[in-house]
From Swiss-Prot:
InterPro entries documented for this protein: Cys_synth, Cys_Synth/Cystath_Beta-Synth, CysM, P-phosphate_BS, TrpB-like_PALP, TrpB-like_PALP_sf
Enzyme Commission no: 2.5.1.47
CDD domains cross-referenced by the UniProt entry: CBS_like (cd01561)
Swiss-Prot/TrEMBL GO biological process terms: cysteine biosynthetic process; cysteine biosynthetic process from serine; cysteine biosynthetic process via S-sulfo-L-cysteine; iron-sulfur cluster assembly; L-cysteine catabolic process to pyruvate
Name by which UniProt lists this protein: Cysteine synthase B
Reaction(s) catalysed (UniProt annotation): O-acetyl-L-serine + hydrogen sulfide = L-cysteine + acetate
This protein's record includes keyword Amino-acid biosynthesis: yes
Cofactor(s) demanded: pyridoxal 5'-phosphate
Organism the protein comes from: Escherichia coli (strain K12)
Function of the molecule: Two cysteine synthase enzymes are found. Both catalyze the same reaction. Cysteine synthase B can also use thiosulfate in place of sulfide to give cysteine thiosulfonate as a product.
Residues that bind pyridoxal 5'-phosphate: N71, G174, T175, T176, G177, T178, S255
Molecular function, one GO term: L-cysteine desulfhydrase activity
Disulfide-bonded cysteines: none
Amino acid sequence: MSTLEQTIGNTPLVKLQRMGPDNGSEVWLKLEGNNPAGSVKDRAALSMIVEAEKRGEIKPGDVLIEATSGNTGIALAMIAALKGYRMKLLMPDNMSQERRAAMRAYGAELILVTKEQGMEGARDLALEMANRGEGKLLDQFNNPDNPYAHYTTTGPEIWQQTGGRITHFVSSMGTTGTITGVSRFMREQSKPVTIVGLQPEEGSSIPGIRRWPTEYLPGIFNASLVDEVLDIHQRDAENTMRELAVREGIFCGVSSGGAVAGALRVAKANPDAVVVAIICDRGDRYLSTGVFGEEHFSQGAGI
């Protein structure tokens, strides 16, 4: 390997050792926090910029715009720094301090909208800025280069790493790029793989997972590529996240806790299954939020 972008992808797949069910099922986790900017979004960020370059839509020195809840922004800021772009990122102001700091460390300009405006407000403002000619909107929610990254890399890696044994794929749904791309790949393989998407229960807030209003549903989402959707409670996502750290040594974020909570539900209901879930990022992006605070462990939550 000679460039940073060549280190994106080919992440490890590891088996749960202590938390898995005792019905013959296996739960495997794809550790996307091992990507250079620390999340699964490195794949989509690279794909969106490289494919736009190939089409002649952007060139180094241009201004790029994107709305993000954190991980995509960090990944885009890294790729922009690597390739010589100016990056403007829009994010709700209730996202963690670590995410803000990482984006700025890569040289990105960060524009905050209010918690009440949320991701919908960030997306609207990003579109307004692009329409005013302030830069090129990458638009991860409607950009086919997002799921294309997972169709060409994540899906094939999982198939190869499981030797084609995978029976269920479980993924959180935010932009839906990961689940859409992986599902497209799995649909083309020699055996059926059940695709399970995760969304927050009504009233739950899980960073990186959304229950989108109809008018904001990502354009890249194809409901026919998802066999089942599970609702995950914020408490279950956070408890599973903490349990992964203390019982499996896997330090990840809240959406990953939700993904594993869903994967365990699927594994328990399907004896002898081979379930693969995506660990989207690392836990160090959430330390300032208090979700790993001592009070949770002293009360036994998630243990």
